[in-house]
Amino acid sequence: MTNFRDARAEDVASIVRLYAEDELGATREVVADSPDEDYMRAFRQIDNNPSHRLVVAEDRGEVVATLQLSFLPHLVLHGGERAQIEAVRVRADRRGSGLGEALFAWAINEARGRGCRLVQLTTNATRPDARRFYERVGFQASHIGMKLTLDAP
């Protein structure tokens, strides 16, 4: 049985492995049995901030999917909070099983329960399968996302 829960420190290595499963993630993540301090520092920052949740789907003791759910206050939408879904990954052998749909239903329900008026996400232009999935679960392509990569300090 799969359950959704907030990630724990001991999940970080499994989460990074999920990030590295696709071509893009494989070029920017460092997979190791013990995650380095940069990953652990980021995990602690997320874990200690009530506006961010790093969530995993766990099945038989294994992390099989993850996403980050962040809550953003805004003046738009009459001061309504919105939820941002990021860093979505489902383990390759679990794709097409309904797990992604269940994870999104859970996340949207969490956002609704918090009073969010909108759930948003972005997806990399190199991930057409992800875009089709997001459209299938009800998201609409409505904006063009842009990013600026900064050099490390």
Annotate each language-model stretch with its function.
Residues 3-17:
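A short beta-loop-alpha structural element at the N-terminal edge
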Residues 20-42:
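Conserved GNAT-fold acetyl-CoA-binding loop/helix
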Residues 54-56, 62-71, 89:
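Conserved beta-strand in the GNAT
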Residues 92, 120-130, 147-151:
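Conserved beta-strand-loop-alpha-helix junction that forms the acyl-donor binding cleft
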Residues 104, 111-123:
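Conserved GNAT acetyl-CoA-binding A-motif
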